[in-house]
Amino acid sequence: AIGSAGLGALVLFAAYSNDLSYFAANGDKYPYFANIGEISFDLSNPYVVAGLIFGGLIPYLFGGIAMTAVGRAAGSIVEEVRRQFKEKPGIMQGKDKPNYGRAVDLLTKAAIREMIVPSLLPVLAPLVVYFGVLLISGSKASAFAALGASLLGVIVNGLFVAISMTSGGGAWDNAKKSFEDGFVDKDGQRHMKGSEAHKASVTGDTVGDPYKDTAGPAVNPAIKI
């Protein structure tokens, strides 16, 4: 899935480059592109370098926002569970039935609300790049070049960020499971469940689950968009 997202985004960049060349060559039909000049993605152009840096920042920013969103949504569920335990003490003994529907409804609303900003980020970022460079340089060619460079930055960095998050999160998750099965280190010492190493792996699993299940896979559509 990650590789297909990278290849798909690469095809979109090729289409973007070809369309720019076509519109620039037919400025009489498309007045906005009239006398725009040649658009190149030469690294000697400072706006291209700026676009690469800005585009490379997007996957990290997207992943960070997604990770904090998971924490806030989980926190709202913890508060709801505590409230139900307080109002219905018999839940722990099986005498009272918890309100599952409210918890699911609360989590669904929190998930949708928290993903609004990450969803808008890849949509608004190209507009910010284009009009920002256009305002600074006054050149449409430089603005389009910076926009294309930002797309390249997202593709390259996003691909490796997604791989890092999914594989790294999976490693943290499996580390906890290995301690539960009785992990033997290189010195022959066995670390069982409840050991200090296992407690550290639980912390790693807490980060690893949203890392591999939320932020990592979510970077794929961000690359394509």
Swiss-Prot record:
Enzyme Commission number: 7.1.3.1
Subcellular location: Cell inner membrane
Superkingdom to which the source organism belongs: Bacteria
GO cellular component, one term: plasma membrane
Catalysed conversion reaction: diphosphate + H2O + H(+)(in) = 2 phosphate + 2 H(+)(out)
First-tier enzyme category under EC: translocase
Assembly notes: Homodimer.
Name used for this protein in its record: Pyrophosphate-energized proton pump 1
